Design a protein with these regions (language model features):
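Sequence/structural signature of beta-propeller domains
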Residues: 1-298
Length: 298
């Protein structure tokens, strides 16, 4: 098993990696999107606007000759909020979630960092192969394996989407394409630079078959130098001290599953971290952001 080094956030913020002289932080300039008519004032966004969040995943693309850094960012399924439980037809209570913008179409966004600023440019909305838009709404009333009601801000229950996607990771394919991990599937979806779906890998057809019983579990996406795509399963077959890493060869559809050990001394007893994102560093190495409740947290 390769050596895994875990660095707490406080230490990571104050310690620079070898060869790095400084770290700069940028607030990305993003456009404001409009909530559906009639919902302004009913949300925590009284003006009826919300920023297009492009930080669900981030992938480095290139550096231009003038020093401009080019990244690609990914939105998630759109703005949501917890909602009060609702009763179904049998009178049983089930959890609910507000979808503030039910027609939201997830996007891939180019981000340029230059002259001390980071700007989001040229958002590309995701569509299926017939150019019909994907939606951030679930296909059915579930969030992973747990049923929940989909509500508008007017407390009206919404039907699921015919083309659902919940983007949770982005990787750049050098053949003018992107790969996106879809938590709803779970699936890996390939898109053209114009945002049109080219290919999709599902459990049993490019992804390990056991993932079919674990919807809602995939997080992050990286592309290794050998072309394999790497994503994380937030669960690990019942093993509390491990997460699962899935590696997929897109051309042959071969896949492997590995165990990623969780440092027990860092996280609060009885909890495990989520994977925020991961980036390939070369030589088979991954830089992974783990998010969780610290051991000494109140």
């Amino acid at each position: 098993m390769p050596e895994i080094k875990t660095v707490p956030q406080e230490e990571a913020e104050n310690r620079l990696p070898e060869g790095i002289e400084k770290i700069e932080r940028f607030a990305v300039e993003v456009p404001q999107l409009t909530l559906p008519s009639g919902t302004a004032g009913k949300a925590p966004l009284p003006e009826g606007l919300f920023p297009m969040s492009v930080g669900c995943s981030l992938a480095f693309s290139s550096e231009r000759t003038d020093g401009t850094l080019l990244f690609y960012g990914l939105t998630d399924r759109g703005p949501t909020l917890p909602a009060p439980s609702v009763r179904d037809g049998s009178g049983a209570l089930r959890p609910a979630r507000y979808f503030l913008s039910p027609m939201f179409q997830p996007r891939i966004v180019r981000i340029e960092v230059t002259a001390g600023k980071a700007r989001s440019l040229s958002p590309v909305a995701l569509t299926n192969a017939e150019a019909k838009p994907f939606s951030g709404l679930p296909a059915r009333a579930d969030d992973g394996a747990k049923p929940f009601a989909i509500l508008s801000l007017a407390n009206e229950e919404l039907s699921g989407s015919l083309r659902p996607i919940d983007p949770e990771g982005l990787a750049i394919d050098p053949e003018s394409a992107f790969w996106v991990v879809d938590r709803y599937g779970p699936a890996l979806r390939q898109f053209s630079r114009q945002g049109v779906e080219r290919e999709v890998l599902f459990p049993g057809a490019g992804l390990p078959a056991f993932l079919a019983a674990r919807p809602g579990s995939l997080r992050s996406l990286s592309r290794l130098a050998d072309g394999r795509l790497v994503t994380f399963d937030r669960n690990a077959l019942g093993l509390t001290r491990f997460l699962t890493v899935i590696a997929v060869e897109p051309k042959t559809k071969a896949s492997q599953a590995y165990l990623w050990p969780v440092e027990p001394g860092i996280w609060k007893r009885g909890t495990r971290p989520f994977i925020g994102d991961a980036a390939a560093l070369g030589d088979g190495r991954l830089l992974v952001i783990e998010q969780g409740t610290a051991r000494d947290a109140p």
